[in-house]
Amino acid sequence: MIAAACFAAGARTAFAYVPEPRLVKSDVEITAIYYPGTEQMSEWDVIAGTCPERKPLLGWFDEGNPEAIDWQIKWAVEHGITSFCVDWYWNKGYRRLEHWLKGYYRAKYRGYLKWFMMYANHNQPGSHSTEDQIAVTKYWIENYFKTPEYYTIDGKPAVCIWDAENLDRDFIDEAAAKGETLKPGEGIKRAFAISERMVREAGLPGIYWIDMWRTKKFDLDYAKRRVEQGYRAAIHYGIEHFSPDLSPEAMKPSDTRNRFGYDAVVATAPKIWDELSRQNVLPFWVIIPTGWDDRPRSFTHSRVITGRTPEKFAEICRRAKAFCDKYGRKHAIVLPINEWQEGSYIEPNEEYGFGMYDAIRDAFCEKPTGGWPKNIRPGDVGMGPYDFPPSFRSPTPRWEFADSVEGWYRQPYGGGELEVKDGSLNFWVNFPRRNYNIRQRVVPFEAAKYKTFRVRMRVTPNAKAGSGGVKNPDMRLKWGTAEHPIIGPGLAIDERRCVASCPVKADGEFYEYAIDLSANPDWKGMVDELWFEACPIMHARVAVDWMRFE
């Protein structure tokens, strides 16, 4: 009675820490794709300023906080999820978005939830090599594979590869540079052989390689090739995008390829399972898609799946469980659970509460005699909040980048690997002309006080990709004011207003550039947001020495 009273009052004295997880049973093993994408408040700002209803029940939380992670673990395992497949980034030794894993290994309840990596190798051409494969495998062995928390199958640590073709391309190119010819697929096989040898020398029985299946139709030759290369299983990412083609009967007359209802996803998922079940060459895990609405990232270029509800998601879960029972499938994967910016999220949030997690539990798990574990929020037991402090906003419109990014953050579909190195702000260009590279909310300043935007920077094309056919590269600056905000109604971007540009050189040398703003009719009012694109050359590396308004 005393504990119940304290619980009702939300007294922290009753629960000094996150209540211990209560496991639920299922005859199907459930993995969830986890994207550790919010290492700073600026990433949450993207959601807060566009789709605030997506706010997690943990708040705009510090994703590396072990206590917050213990809540994630508790909620996952109490709803049948037993492992996370975590996006893991490595680019020639450069690692990023490690904050969640570092916090996980300090979390009290980490023993309840295994993890393994989805090697997110969507890097620039030339990033993979024999030397790099040795280095990355060494890192895996020394830091992850021998820890009890790392997920294994038959004693083999599991590794999912995001883009095998990137790996294959670079190993084929490396061989060609030495006068050797490799056929498509042999590069992957060579890379895997390096890792297999190293893990066996370290006392492990091998690696359980998992493929990221790419096609919407069954392809027996594809499956056979993957097995020959060393893969042992497959999953599929983004099956909801195939809905317009595979389930036209579920599309409404007003639907388009980039805007359609979740009913089409409910209809499509079983068709994908049926397609992949036609072969037993490469075992696949039953995919449970969580939706898509990437307006916070893609704006005008977004794909929006509407009408997603816990009830409709529950229907997919029930069908998935029935499929597993019918065909003896013992592994399902929910993907992803926390892509907040892309609209693929089911972790407990303000919009749906625990509804999406409950749908998984109710479909796959055996209800205990005493009932399901109670869905507890941090505030219920006097814990939290775990929010980041507000994002830094530059007090003056000038940036030197001596030792920090000074409030700038990357556009997810525009810039990658943002960091300060050697006194410069560094990043590389992805999705040119789809988005700007970096952005910042600034302390509002009066446009009339400044006539010029100056930048000293270096643009270096990727050695393999070159200029990508861009003959006259330019840099762009976009600004927002109260009268003309950058993000307009419907999360659309007006590319015609509040933008200026100038030519740049992409030859690996530093130059100073200036954009004349004085004659631009939109350069007025109080500027409160800035977006910057260094150049439209895919994979180019950029180093910004300084920026300033004068």
Model-inferred region functions:
Residues K25, S394, Q411, V420, ...:
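Short, surface-exposed loop/turn motifs at beta-strand boundaries within globular domains
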Residues F15-S394, R458:
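Glycan-processing catalytic domains of CAZymes
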Residues P157, L418, G423-N426, R458:
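Hydrophobic residues embedded in beta-strands of well-ordered beta-sheets
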Residues M1-A9:
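Bacterial N-terminal signal peptides
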Residues D403-S424:
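Extracellular glycan-recognition surfaces and repeat-rich motifs
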Residues A8-A16:
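Boundary at the C-terminal end of the N-terminal hydrophobic targeting segment
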Residues F427-M526, A534-F549:
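Extracellular ligand-binding interfaces
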